């Protein structure tokens, strides 16, 4: 959700129980403005909160003028002091794949994992147990990246792509019409397209290049991983991810108000294919 309209956005997302105490709201309003100024971001998003056993991680993201350029991610434990996280890598994803369970809420906490490594001694080769330590900060970076790639979404028309390949906020976007808000095809993943590149020219013929340049939720796997509900007498549409429980997207039809927020434990629902 956009930090510039934080209070309204939190109100729209409150139907899912994603609320903040008054003092946290006040701290966020002030500190995110300072983050935007100090880091010279074009936009700042309040991404959400990852619940830990000892403390919670409050997450914010900074965007440049090109909305699909790599984002800067920051975390805070008190909504006042923000620390910049390193970019996510494939190596990080491999490292944290062996870690499960809840976050502790301490970035310096280290998880211990025992793995077998082959050791050569002369002509003999044998397996030796090695204890590998993985920092919670590394896990935090990778989980945020995974959630972003899988379930961060925007409504169709919220962004547009220039002929030069740069993506900007669409200032003329006035919201989705009521006839379109219940369709998964009206929502796009907020990342570079992956599936779109595999479509044939015939399939792309009906698409508007300046608007339909992202992957639609329509073909997400597994099918049925999104729940769509109309709330407040059709004045609000809410999408919830069943794959990453805690991700809520909201949009007030025929208005510019939309956004998403994640409030959860940072654990993926691996059983979803068997539950559908």
Swiss-Prot record:
Keywords carried by this UniProt record: Cell projection, Cilium, Cilium biogenesis/degradation, Cytoplasm, Cytoskeleton, Flagellum
UniProt entry tagged with the keyword Cytoplasm: yes
Disruption phenotype: RNAi-mediated depletion in the ependymal cilia results in a near complete central pair apparatus loss and alters the ciliary beat pattern from planar to rotational. Multiple radial spokes proteins, including those in the head, are markedly down-regulated in the cilia.
Tissue-specific expression: Expressed in the testis, trachea, lung, oviduct and ependymal cells (at protein level).
Subcellular location: Cytoplasm, Cytoskeleton, Cilium axoneme; Cytoplasm, Cytoskeleton, Flagellum axoneme; Cell projection, Kinocilium
UniProt xrefs under InterPro entries: RSP9
GO cellular component entries: 9+2 motile cilium; axoneme; extracellular region; kinocilium; motile cilium; radial spoke; radial spoke head; radial spoke head 1
BP terms from Gene Ontology: axonemal central apparatus assembly; axoneme assembly; cilium movement; epithelial cilium movement involved in extracellular fluid movement; flagellated sperm motility; mating; radial spoke assembly
Domain of life: Eukaryota
Similarity section: Belongs to the flagellar radial spoke RSP9 family.
Subunit composition and interactions: Component of the axonemal radial spoke 1 (RS1) and 2 (RS2) complexes, at least composed of spoke head proteins RSPH1, RSPH3, RSPH9 and the cilia-specific component RSPH4A or sperm-specific component RSPH6A, spoke stalk proteins RSPH14, DNAJB13, DYDC1, ROPN1L and NME5, and the RS1 complex-specific anchor protein IQUB. Interacts with IQUB. Interacts with RSPH3B. Interacts with RSPH4A. Interacts with RSPH6A. Interacts with CFAP61. Interacts with LRRC23.
Function in brief: Functions as part of axonemal radial spoke complexes that play an important part in the motility of sperm and cilia. Essential for both the radial spoke head assembly and the central pair microtubule stability in ependymal motile cilia. Required for motility of olfactory and neural cilia and for the structural integrity of ciliary axonemes in both 9+0 and 9+2 motile cilia.
Protein name: Radial spoke head protein 9 homolog
Source organism: Mus musculus (Mouse)
Lineage, opening ranks: Eukaryota, Metazoa, Chordata, Craniata, Vertebrata
Gene encoding the protein: Rsph9
